[in-house]
Amino acid sequence: MTAWTLDRARHTYSVPYWSDGYFDIDGRGRLVARPHGDEGPAIALSDVVERARGMGHKLPLLVRFSDVLGHRLGKLQQAFAQAMRELDYRGGYTAVYPIKVNQHAGVAGELARVGAPVGEAPYTADFGLEAGSKPELMAVLALARPGSIVVCNGYKDREFIRLALMSRTLGLDTILVIEKPSEVGLIIEESRALGVAPVVGIRLRLASLGAGKWQNSGGDKAKFGLSPRQVLDAVDKLQAAGLGESVAMLHFHMGSQISNVRDIASGMREAVNYFVELSKRGCPIRLMDAGGGLGVDYEGTRSRSFCSINYGLDQYAYTLLQPLAEACAEHGLPQPRLITEAGRAMTAHHAVMVVNVSEVERAPEGRVGPAQPGEPAVIRHLREVQAELDVRPPVELFHEAQHHLAEGQTLFALGQLGVEQRAQLDDLFYAIAHAVRQRLSAEEKSHRPVLDELNERLVDKYFVNFSVFESIPDVWAIEQVFPIVPVERLDEEPTRRGVIADLTCDSDGRIDTYVESEALDASLPLHALKPGESYLLAIAMVGAYQETLGDIHNLFGDTDTVAVHLDGAGGYLLDTQRRGDTTDVMLDYVGYKLADLRARYRANVEAANLPEATSAEFLAALETGLTGYTYLSEEPLE
């Protein structure tokens, strides 16, 4: 057996493969963040949690490493600046952040603060913002840097359009993207009413689309965008209104988290044909917005799997720019500025959800007691299987044990076995299952199906103090994968395999797929709990979409949130970004009047005719419960 080392720990939890250099394991076996990548300072998650607790924060705790945002943005911009130099592409590039990915001020505001041009002219990579609704637009108008690009996507009414047009007079390069034909007339009318010339983008409904869980945002069945005929009609209508010069941008979206770079290349080639054709029709296209799609490798498998990608930033940039450069050269067209809306790639790595294990239910070990006179035949058959563990093929033995277990379960349901015999049935089966697993090998092809089944069945359940639906809703909604790593003890070999279940009263409140050793598995290597010690897990790469998609199932609310900022001297500062929701906040949200609740509590206590001291104690406990954190407390009751 290979000795446990830190490198084995890194490989077991696939840290080098999904983290892109932003996380590692230090010499003390602690998970550390590296906000500036491989070469930057390392911050132990356990230290952050300890300091946050000293500030009054509780688990579960969302930890933002704010410097990762700027670093990710810089890497994206540098990739495009390099591709522009290689292709001698002089149109420029803008990394636009679509704030729907994470609207929180600590994220969108931080990106807006650090977003600045990268590279030397004419190969400059800039930064802009995107809004897809009126509330998002109001945030963007306050965050955007003067002169920067603001892309307005989503369905629009007159107020949305008017606000966008007004922002142009305030010094922003705001583009109204036409998502449906009816918006053309509204833009014409509102621009005349305000006396402001619009800058218009047209969203193309491409036939090309990326495969995966997010593919419905592209292709012929897409919710947004114009068909070829609708594109031509929109251009004709704008030109007839004297606004032909306003058609400055083409926008398209092939899907989110595109795994295969070939899908990106196909979509870009199709969009470039639109660019050439509309330019020939007199549209002064100066911007090409390739939308989202740039994925991140949640799995660390570097593959075409839905939660992985088979390309890097440099290849992505080159794949988008090359067909555009070639088309401009072939047709003698001015090179447009390329825009992407790669919000997931900017934000996913920066946030980690730290959760504590509240309890572990060990997998049944099974036991073989002495045979009893008059045992049912089904139990005798299992004893016979158990006695032959060393002499018969393990797969054959397991299937036979399964048959007898199913037979016994049926007999119990019919009332022909007692509960003691039913328990004995399980004891024997699990003893056999553990012994069979010891004889199986992953190298033996015929063993793999049974080994996989046993690895799913013979696992511990780790009950964790958080809500899947609130903190990682895409696990439930689309079976997304997030890497999970113990915060400490990574210098110790994990001796258990476990699955994670949350606090909610819902069977979907669990995680079924785990990142392990550059692959996916149905369970995760974890450590046995030590008495008196907390066991913390880090759910990584939760910075994109999860916070605002989260719901309040079982009235579990937002968690405490802290932001880590490097201080430039090798240390870091820790800021409170948000105190988590308390019970009274959640009850108020669903319509309960807090004054009425308190009055009911008091009336019930008074009706119980308790001693005065006991009544006061009960009322104090009820008030504490009403105003406390919605998650489990680690603190003992006084």
Task: Give, region by region, the residue ranges found by the protein language model.
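Low-complexity, highly charged intrinsically disordered N-terminal segments
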Residues: D20, I25-Q103
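Short, glycine-/Ser/Thr-/acidic-enriched flexible segments
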Residues: R30, D38, V68, N102-H104, ...
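Active-site-proximal beta-alpha core segment in soluble small-molecule metabolic enzymes
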Residues: D88-D289, L294-E299, N310-Y318, P323, ...
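Noncatalytic alpha-helical scaffold of FAD-dependent oxidoreductases
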Residues: K75, G119, Q315-Q322, G332, ...
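C-terminal helical cap(s) of enzyme catalytic domains, especially alpha/beta-barrels
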Residues: R304-L313, A317, V355-V357, Q372-P376
